[in-house]
Amino acid sequence: MNFFKRLRLHTRLLLRSKFVLISLILLLNLGLLLGIQIYRDPAFPGSLISSAAYEFGLHKHGPYYNDNVDDLKRYTFMGLLTLPTSEHDVYFNATRVLVYKLKHHPETKSKYPVHVLVMKGVDEWKIERLRLDGAEIIMVDQIKTEDLIESGLSIGMGSYRYQYMFTKLSVFEQTQFDKVCILDSDLLVLKNMDDIFDTPYVYESPAEPDMFSFPIFKKPDDEEDYQFSDNFDAYGAPRSEFYPYLLGACDDRNPGHATPPEESETFNAGLMLVHPSSLHMHRIKKIARYPYMYDDARMMEQSLLNLAYNKYGWFPWTRLDFSYNGVWVTEEDLPYLRAAHGKFWEYDNTEFPQILTAEWHKAFGELLAFHDYVVE
């Protein structure tokens, strides 16, 4: 083959290569245009572009914020320890079991930090013990009933220990975190629960709240019927500033419920997933002033929060899968539960399957053995 024939052959090959390259560029541009169109089209809210934006941290409050290793500390599990200060405080031991399950147990331990809100006045040795157990401690003041409610009003507290439970509201002040899963000490973790943090924020308000579906209440010395309505002037901020928000919880339920349980009007506050917010804390305190609006606070913070995040209002609570908080556990519930809720340290309690008593005491024994063998 002479020189000119070779030159013509190479020229043809080069032209073909350029044609292929140009074709690829055109196809890529068409794909990009299609992607942009999908992103703009409200019929495709979960587009690849918007998902990528979350993945790469462009939306720092988006539901994928925890995918980044550097962001793990922005989410946390959180317990609560209040008074009394006695060596035989069963709730102290229960808090230790909770921390052990979330920090060290091979089947349930979390990749997220574990904090404990500790009310000022708790014995220092208990605080130090929780630190050695692996918890990070946040000291908080007691939120007293008299500091919240209007002078002259009273509450129908169901238990002496309930007097400290408004202190749990301090979780809304922990704005160093984006999401907090706060758990009562009598929750026994049975399976890993890290995916609870995948629960998305609520970014938009309802079109219009169904105020007529709110519970009816009466004011003291007044026989008129009233229903709750948010007063944003009293809160000192427009409604739009309260978004995004998050209060996720499981349906409250009664003994003998079906499995899975039916949806309820109210949630159980033994486990909540919240987006801490000073504005929401201020709003909650304003609502708390009038306990006659929320059943005289018979269930303390649970009664209050069920009004503040009523499903018919501007800030409806987010329903979590029932498996995260097994209330009034039945035998049928057990295979599904990630956490069971009850005083399982009580040997003679027949309100729940006895295997949970064995599980709790097994976990307590494991934590004692674990820390005996760990150099502190």
From Swiss-Prot:
Where, by residue number, does the polypeptide cross the bilayer?
Answer: 19-39
Q: Which residues form a coiled coil?
A: none
Q: Which key words tag this protein in UniProt?
A: Cytoplasm, Membrane, Nucleus, Transmembrane, Transmembrane helix
The name under which this protein is listed is Uncharacterized protein C4C3.09
**Gene Ontology molecular functions:** alpha-1,3-galactosyltransferase activity; glycosyltransferase activity
What GO terms fall under cellular component here?
Answer: cytoplasm; cytosol; Golgi apparatus; membrane; nucleus
InterPro entries found in the cross-reference section: GNT1/Glycosyltrans_8, Nucleotide-diphossugar_trans
Membrane topology per the entry is:
Single-pass membrane protein
> Which terms does the UniProt entry file under GO BP?
protein N-linked glycosylation; protein O-linked glycosylation
Q: Which family does it belong to?
A: To S.pombe SpAC5H10.12c.
Record's superkingdom?
A: Eukaryota
Its subcellular locations are: Cytoplasm; Nucleus; Membrane
- Where this protein primarily resides, as one coarse class? cytoplasm
